[in-house]
Amino acid sequence: VENNSTTDEIFDYYRKISEDPRIHLICWKKEFNYSAINNFGVKNARGEYLLFLNNDVTVITEDWMGEMLGVCQRREVGAVGVKLIYPDNTIQHAGCVIGIGGIAGHMFVDMPADRTGYLHKASILQDMSAVTAACMMMKRSAFDKVGGFTEELAVAFNDVDLCLKTTKAGYLVVYDPYARLYHMESKTRGAENNEVKVRRFQREIEYMRCNWIDILKN
């Protein structure tokens, strides 16, 4: 899904990959809304498995997609997330815990990627409450059943909300540490201190509190 790119290099890249009949390039011309963009992509997708992948994620292990698919094909699984690593080889994501920071947060952030963490949880295939959608695979049937991403959550918590809807529908959400990718997300990204962004973030927090209060309390 193309979203308001401006550089010549990216359009040269699009022309090159468009020669592959397996690739279908579509353009989102509205303002940024992570949930709406992904829902738009799904409407134009044809497969029974969906892969959500941010543009700042790069491959470490070549078999990462096959690894995710093998887990996602299990009858009881609805979604699969991966181990994401910063360029300095510390952990960016090893699953999400509900309640960290008030709503949800990543486990083992900034821990060296070769460490296994408390009870080896950073290195064990396991069920989670949520995983990040920076790299997440879902069954199409599960995605459709839960209604996709909630578009009121334009930036924050949309993946957490989707995962909670998925588990509520009876599926498992699985963290797979054997699929590893780099995530170039800035470790020093500033706070949401723009007034418009602050108000948007507060609305998203309120949405999560209103819709998932029973889970957040526990």
What kind of feature is each model-predicted range?
Residues 1-31:
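Acidic donor-binding segment of Leloir-type glycosyltransferases
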Residues 2-3, 53-56, 150:
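Active-site acidic Asp-centered loop
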Residues 28-45, 63:
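Glycine-rich, basic loop-to-helix element that forms the pyrophosphate-binding segment
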Residues 50:
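Short aromatic/hydrophobic "clamp" motif used to bind/position activated sugar donors
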Residues 57-103:
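Conserved donor NDP-sugar-binding/catalytic core segment of glycosyltransferases
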Residues 78, 88, 100-127, 137, ...:
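C-terminal, non-catalytic tails of nucleotide-sugar-dependent glycosyltransferases
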Residues 80-83, 176-177, 184:
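Short glycine/serine/threonine-enriched helix-capping/active-site loop
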